[in-house]
Amino acid sequence: MLLSDRDIRAELASGRVTIDPFDPAMIQPSSIDVRLDKYFRVFENHRYPHIDPAVEQPDLTRLVETEGDEPFILHPGEFVLASTYEVIALPDDLAGRLEGKSSLGRLGLLTHSTAGWIDPGFTGHVTLELSNVATLPIKLWPGMKIGQLCLFRTSSPAEHPYGSPVYGSRYQGQRGPTPSRSWQNFHRTKI
C-alpha cells in the first residue's frame, strides 16, 4: 500500500521514518521530494579497458565536490553517481521507491538507471544514477529537488531487514554517492 501525505507525516512524527535534514514543504500527496547533494562520482573511463561487475575496480570512479554555489554540468550521454542530500532511515515494514521528478525528466535527466528500490531497514543517503539523455548539457544545482521518495507498507515486517547479516547489505549506512560493490557478492549461475 502506497502511503499518503497523512501517513507519511504520521510515520515521521512517530520517528519510525527519519529524513535528515527534514523540510515539511517537501511532502507531496503521496511522496516526499528529495534534494541533490554536492558530491558526484565521475567515471574514469581511461583506467580500465571495460567494467567487470565480478572484480573490484577501485579507480573506476572519482569523487568530485562542487565549489561554492556552482552547479555540476552533466553533458549529453554522460552518466554519474550522485546522492540525496537527505539521510533516510526506514523501519522493517516500510519500503521505498525513488522516482524522478517529471519536470526534470522532460529536460532529459534520468534520476536512476535501475536502482530505485529501497528495502525495509535501509539507512543512509540514497545513491542516484544520473544520466543526461538530452542533446544539451544540464546544470545540476546542489540542493535542487532531484526526485521523490514513495513509501510502501509491506504485508508484514521483513524477517531480515536490510542491514541484517543475512543479506550482506553492502550499502547500509552509505554516505554520499557510493560506487558499485557488486564484486563483494557477485553471483553467476553456470549455463
UniProtKB/Swiss-Prot annotation:
Q: Which residues form the active site?
A: E129
- Residues that bind dCTP, according to the entry? K101, S102, S103, L104, G105, R106, D119, T127, L128, E129, Q148, Y162, Q174
UniProt-annotated stretches for the region Disordered = 163-191
Cytoplasm is among the record's keywords: no
> Site positions for Important for bifunctional activity, renumbered to this chain?
G116, W117
SUPFAM superfamilies to which the protein is assigned, alphabetical? dUTPase-like
Q: Which superkingdom, per the lineage?
A: Bacteria
Please give one Gene Ontology molecular function term for this protein.
Answer: dCTP deaminase activity
Q: Does the keyword Nucleotide-binding apply?
A: yes
Arranged from A to Z, the UniProt key words for this protein are: Hydrolase, Nucleotide metabolism, Nucleotide-binding
- According to its UniProt record, which reaction does this protein catalyse? dCTP + 2 H2O = dUMP + NH4(+) + diphosphate
Q: CDD domains of this UniProt entry?
A: trimeric_dUTPase
The pathway it acts in is: Pyrimidine metabolism; dUMP biosynthesis; dUMP from dCTP: step 1/1
The record's Gene Ontology biological-process terms are: dUMP biosynthetic process; dUTP biosynthetic process; nucleobase-containing small molecule interconversion
Indicate the transmembrane segments per the record: none
Q: What is its EC number?
A: 3.5.4.30
Q: What class of enzyme is it?
A: hydrolase
- UniProt xrefs under NCBIfam families: dCTP_deam
Q: What does the subunit comment say? A: Homotrimer.
> What is the recorded function of this protein according to its Swiss-Prot or TrEMBL entry?
Bifunctional enzyme that catalyzes both the deamination of dCTP to dUTP and the hydrolysis of dUTP to dUMP without releasing the toxic dUTP intermediate.
Q: Which family does it belong to?
A: Belongs to the dCTP deaminase family.
Q: What name does this protein carry?
A: dCTP deaminase, dUMP-forming
Q: Which organism is it from?
A: Acidothermus cellulolyticus (strain ATCC 43068 / DSM 8971 / 11B)
Supply the gene name: dcd
